[in-house]
Amino acid sequence: MSEHRHRSGDLHQQNKGFKGGKHDSKGAIKRRAQGKIETNGARQSIKNLAIVNNKDAMRQKHQKLVKSKKNELLERKRLGLPDQVAPRVVTIIKLSESCNTKKVKEMLLQKFKLNINTGEMEMDNEETLNNKNNNNDNFTTISLTSKVRMMLLECQTMAYDQVIEFCKLSDIILFVIDANQAKLNSEAERIFTIVKAQSVPTVIEIIQNLDQTPIKKRNELKKSIQSVFHFHFPNEPKVLPMDTNDECSQVLRYIENIHVNEIIWRKVRPYMLIEKSSYIPETKVVTIDGFIRGNNLSAKQIIHIPDYGDFQIEKIELIDDPHIRKKSYYTNNNNNNSNNNNTGGGEMEQDKKINILDKVDQKDKDTLQTWNVPDPMDNEQALPTAEEMKEIEANKKKKLVPKGTSGYQSSWYLDNESDEEEENFENEDLDMNQEEMGQDKEEEMGEEEEMGEEEEEEEEGQEELEEVKESNKWKGIKHKSQITDELLKDSDDEDDDENKEEQSEDEDEDERKQLQQDEILYPDEVDTPGNVPSRIRFSKFRGLKSFRSSPWDVKENLPIDYAKIFQFHSFNQSMRASIAILDNAPAKPDMYVRIHLVNGPKQLVERNTTAITTKPEVAVGLYRYENKISLLHFSVEKHKSYEETVRSKEEVYFHFGWRKFSTSPIYSISSPNCDKQKFEKFLLPARNTMATIYGPITYPPAPLLIFNGKDCNELVATGYLSSVNPDRIICKRIILTGVIAKSISKKFVTVKDMFYYPEDINWFKKVELYTKMGRVGHIKEPLGTHGRMKCQFDGTMNQQDTVCMNLYKRVYPKWIKDDSSLLKLE
């Protein structure tokens, strides 16, 4: 009997609703807010946002802001930093060819009465700061307030390599879009991808020609542009038109008050936007001027300039800030050691004060050597000295050998007698010696007859072997001695991979796509060669009981390239120690300094003095060991816009942190719970892949952009530095497959087409088998002489099942090209 339950009728009791009292509930406050909540920094409570601040609260908030600014100023003085921070680097980038970046720059400069062509003031204006001593006319510095300055740059093209160089050092990016072409094209999408892959700086969207749109459609057009922009940059809400002077003033106010995002990988290293450079021919020293940004700089460090290489620092000088608003604002407490710096590129002004911040001896500087020169005799046994050879001759034992035996043949005979037995043998009677000599002669005659018979048998065997070779030649079968040279060429090693890559270049893209599709459908499956024994063809491969847990010695059979690279005993400990060295470095951020580079790049000076540069030049201070070569691993993902195939060991172009170079990575799948990673032939889309190269050591974090060539026309993949570890094992897997020829019983079957020689079956007999339907088994014995074998499995077999065998070998990336700038010896 079911349990009776009461069901209320129409006249059921109605209780009173809950009354929260004078305060509102969280849900009521949230509904009233309607999502119009703007938070700065940490997340705030909804109840706190719902309270309207009165005058006392607003006054208290203002006092806290003033106090925080005073504390910040005191902290800067305590650390020895200048009163004014370095100018904010603002870059103008267009998103379509119809956009006019020159007009945007002209409007911003005309607001301060600056001429865009000359960069000079049309009227006297203290608020405008223009560096007239710069070699590069692309730099224009403007003082927005007494504390905030702006350095305005213009990216004149949409070339990806130019956009990357500007984005790497920009604090604020002004993206310019044309209202007549509101939809983003593929190039604009890739520019957004490039910016996001390098960590997003502060971004403002500028809309041009919005005044040409009908008034009724302006709001709708602006909302559509804003929705697209917020999709790529959800934390950047600033989308502003800029067609009038009032709108230009609004943009400047946002630039002045907007919070600048900190980019971690850029902040941890000292870097400088080179504003001026000169060459001293007497000492072959190149000087570069600019603001130190990011971290502290020491003269012990190595300076890296993209496209030019690494250089040592002779000294670092503190000079007057040429962008200062008023000379009275700047006071140099360290006014000693001021002198004139006569350079080949021009003389310094007499009123500028120079103070040497840091200068170290040559022995204390980091070396420029990037790789080790391996010694091929390192693993060889040391040759014995003359004294050791004399001891060997003195202790050399005498052997009893048949008469007529040569010194080479005497080494075949074992010497099991002791020294005492030899002495006793030498002290025996002459008669005994004669008897033994007679016996020795008889033995010699018998041995000569036996050796003669053996020689005849060998000759007969050679004749038979020649006959077999002759018959096999007509059958298409090669003898083992004949295929030795071919195996050296066809073996699955690095040389073979390179040959395959050269052949793949001749293949058209359709064939490469077909190979990639086959790799997706049938991963790692290979055909067993019929004319070469598998035990020789796959001699470098091995079987593993478990890919995850089976041991593999990381120091086993390493290539000669591993003798050239550097390895850390503890990478994290070395990284922390290298970063801690810069804590007490004398050159602080926001200081305007002059760096003297030993044997600096003269081409840099010539380029800056002959023409207006299309991209800015930057100098980066490297940590200790960051110019050494090691094995680097990157986490990458193929970009959806790149449809062509990318093979392992195919040359691509890396934009890696501040560096850029050509390299040939190998790809693998990362397994977090395994000490071995599986090699991938292709960089497949929609899959997180690891790329491994020989490259300069870099402490993470560091972003990565991969292009198909040095011209950077097409973006291949994006990623970041994962680790620096030469002990990471990357295994190439091949799968040998066979089909079931006959079922002997439920668990015993005959397998064919996996091998073609019974010797190969015995060679790989201990390797575990499995099927595509989940059965596991092993080889029992070969059947016949044509490669069939009897196998046993753990369950009933299906006749349509496929038998597989996994074999593995360790692979390594290609070494850096000899003409690369990454290889350098002192």
From Swiss-Prot:
Residues 1-37, 329-348, 397-532 are annotated as: Disordered. Pfam families: AARP2CN, RIBIOP_C, Tsr1_G-like. Keywords: Nucleus, Ribosome biogenesis. Residues 86-261 form the Bms1-type G domain. It is found in: Nucleus, Nucleolus. Residues 416-434, 441-467, 491-510 have a biased composition (Acidic residues). Required during maturation of the 40S ribosomal subunit in the nucleolus. This is Pre-rRNA-processing protein TSR1 homolog. It comes from Dictyostelium discoideum. The gene is tsr1.
